[in-house]
UniProtKB/Swiss-Prot annotation:
Record has Glycoprotein as a keyword: no
Highest taxon above the source species: Eukaryota
Residue sites binding FAD per the record: 70-84
One MF term in the entry's GO annotations: electron-transferring-flavoprotein dehydrogenase activity
Record has Metal-binding as a keyword: yes
Self-association state and partner proteins as the record states: Monomer.
Name of the protein described by the UniProt record: Electron transfer flavoprotein-ubiquinone oxidoreductase, mitochondrial
Coiled coil segments of this chain: none
GO annotations of cellular component type: membrane; mitochondrial inner membrane; mitochondrial membrane; mitochondrion
Species of the source: Rattus norvegicus (Rat)
Length: 616
């Protein structure tokens, strides 16, 4: 049975809008029972199947289904670029192609977070008339600075022409606003954009090719029972499904092994990026200034750095942020607290003094570069943007490459869909030309040139060894060296036992420059329907205490930038239990990446939940 998916008639859409007007429930709520020595956390139905649960007997499990030519998962820069380019080509050649785009955020851009200093190359290719259309590129870079920080001093480092971190010609943007604007352009071209729809499942044809996706169900109690308002998710079928989920996509995890996409690449390595927006004293405001630093407060073996961007947005606004590589080894390290400590540096604090923090957020990012890019195409689908990971790490940019990958995917798909001799060995189209075209583009050339810079930081000199490598080999050879360095394995394998590491004493936040975690999360606008199954699931409820806490001193309580994970005393008897405050989750994916036991599995909550970023 096929039912037309519309914003006005769809029951799931009506339910989603009903959720949006509910009052926010308390941020922290226990997720464990105290009736057992090893408490059981209420887990998702993917772990406890409904067909074995008597409470689901007699519930109508029929799903509405829709047919499209192309379905896109994720309305970020890559997904929107693909949608827009498809519709541009369809208009140019007078073809009728149905493109549906689903986004888990309540509004387009509400889950988007980046620095962001934009290389406009791909954006200008997509929108040659971007100025006439009023695109929100308001702040061209006017000053570009880089420095090494010690605890008390700032050592300037010249940015020579040709080095990857040069920002001449770039724009400082609020990426969420740019994505929102792109969403408007997509809808004007005829793309069907559906915010508040969380893609939860990959669907397959009988021959194993991708058939499309299904959005998640709504109206389920946190104990897994159906509510009276239960609505089944929606199926979206397509000839080609584009996965543009962003870093560490939860759907991509489902088919990486199925299609063996990582057989010929290194493990991906990640960073966690934390960001705040501040309104500062106008006398300190330098619109167009870009500052990047490495060094303090991180040691040389912990990859990371900072940014401070002055935006020209009608008020004295600055974006400050801190990135920590998730291959760090000390389980006592807290990326959030390192960020708060960094703001007290003598070269940073004066800019923020007297100002007001107005927003906070966090998101994981890919740092593996060329060596970690998986196979990009498979029968019925393909990967674009930050999902496979096209970030140019030394350039500290990935939006431009993500956009270009989306455009190239659209062009290859359009060519195959409109071919008069369309042939496919599988029910879902296998668009292999996309990967071939990407490898011939400036994206691949750019990533190949800088491929050795990030892994060069793994040596005995750490980050400083990477800087030396950049200054010698990249400066001379421009990426033409006849070797390719390898990454050292998955980030989840890098933590040392707590007994082998020195605890880190972090200063107490002063409430003016540095802040506590929960007051920070409150500025992210994060909210989830409280009475729903936990979307942060555990494969084994005993592992957090018996392994992570006993060996690594519970690193999840520190690597999470939203206070989701806490070890609290058992209500009865001695010992601790893991409490999951799922309401706090900002969808950064750090837990799914860094958990040393790989016991945490992040799945989508009900559509519309999560952060509500405004131009982050």
């Amino acid at each position: 049975m096929l039912v037309r998916l519309t914003k006005l008639s769809c029951p799931a859409y009506q339910w989603f809008h009903a959720l949006k007007i509910k009052k926010c429930l308390p941020l922290c709520a226990p997720r464990c029972s105290s009736t057992s020595a090893v408490p059981q956390i209420t887990t998702h139905y993917t772990i406890h199947p409904r067909e074995k649960d008597k409470r689901w007997e007699g519930v109508n499990m029929e799903r509405f289904a829709e047919e499209a030519d192309v379905v896109i998962v994720g309305a970020g820069p890559a997904g929107l670029s693909a949608a827009i380019r498809l519709k541009q080509l369809a208009a140019e050649q007078e073809k009728d192609i149905r493109v549906c785009l689903v986004e888990k955020a309540a509004q387009i851009g509400a889950h988007t977070l980046s620095g962001a200093c934009l290389d406009p190359a791909a954006f200008k290719e997509l929108f040659p008339d971007w100025k006439e259309k009023g695109a929100p590129l308001n702040t061209p870079v006017t000053e570009d600075r880089f420095a090494i920080l010690t605890e008390k001093h700032r050592i300037p480092v010249p940015i020579l022409p040709g080095l990857p971190m040069n920002n001449h010609g770039n724009y400082i943007v609020r990426l969420g606003h740019l994505v929102s604007w792109m969403g408007e352009q997509a809808e004007a071209l005829g793309v069907e954009v559906y915010p508040g729809y969380a893609a939860a499942e990959v669907l397959y044809h009988e021959d194993g090719s991708v058939k499309g996706i299904a959005t998640n169900d709504v109206g389920i109690q946190k104990d897994g029972a159906p509510k009276t308002t239960f609505e089944r998710g929606l199926e979206l079928h397509a000839k080609v499904t584009i996965f543009a989920e962003g870093c560490h996509g939860h759907l991509a995890k489902q088919f990486y092994k199925k299609f063996d996409l990582r057989a010929s690449c290194d493990a991906q390595t990640y960073g966690i990026g934390l960001k705040e927006l501040w309104v500062i004293d106008e006398k300190k405001w330098k619109p167009g200034r870009v500052d990047h630093t490495v060094g303090w407060p991180l040691d040389r073996h912990t990859y990371g750095g900072s940014f401070l961007y002055h935006l020209n947005e009608g008020e004295p606004l600055v974006a400050v942020g801190f990135v920590v590589g998730l291959d760090y080894q000390n389980p006592y390290l807290s990326p959030f607290r390192e960020f708060q400590r960094w703001k007290h540096h003598p070269s940073i604090r004066p800019t923020l003094e007297g100002g007001k923090r107005i927003a906070y957020g966090a998101r994981a990012l890919n740092e593996g570069g060329l060596q970690s890019i998986p196979k990009l195409t498979f029968p019925g689908g393909l990967l674009i943007g930050c999902s496979p990971g096209f970030m140019n790490v030394p350039k500290i940019k990935g939006t431009h490459t993500a956009m270009k990958s989306g455009s190239l995917a659209a062009e290859a798909i359009f060519k195959q869909l409109t071919s008069e001799n369309l042939q496919s060995k599988t029910a879902g189209l296998h668009v292999t030309e996309y990967e071939d075209n990407l490898k011939q583009s400036w994206v691949w050339k750019e990533l190949h040139a800088v491929r050795n810079i990030r892994p060069s930081c793994h040596g005995i000199l750490g980050v400083y060894g990477g800087m030396i490598y950049t200054g010698i080999f990249y400066w001379i050879l421009r990426g033409m060296e006849p070797w390719t360095l390898k990454h050292k394995g998955s980030d989840s394998e890098q933590l040392k036992p707590a007994k082998d590491c020195t605890p880190i004493e972090y200063p107490k936040p002063d409430g003016q420059i540095s802040f506590d975690l929960l007051s920070s999360v409150a500025l992210s606008g994060t909210n989830h329907e409280h009475d729903q199954p936990a979307h942060l699931t555990l494969k084994d409820d005993s592992i957090p205490v018996n392994r992570n806490l006993s060996i690594y001193d519970g690193p999840e309580q520190r690597f999470c930038p939203a206070g989701v994970y806490e070890f609290v005393p058992l209500e009865q008897g001695d010992g601790f239990r893991l409490q999951i405050n799922a309401q706090n989750c900002v969808h950064c994916k750090t837990c799914d990446i860094k958990d040393p036991s790989q016991n945490i599995n992040w799945v989508v909550p009900e559509g519309g939940g999560g952060p509500a970023y405004n131009g982050m």
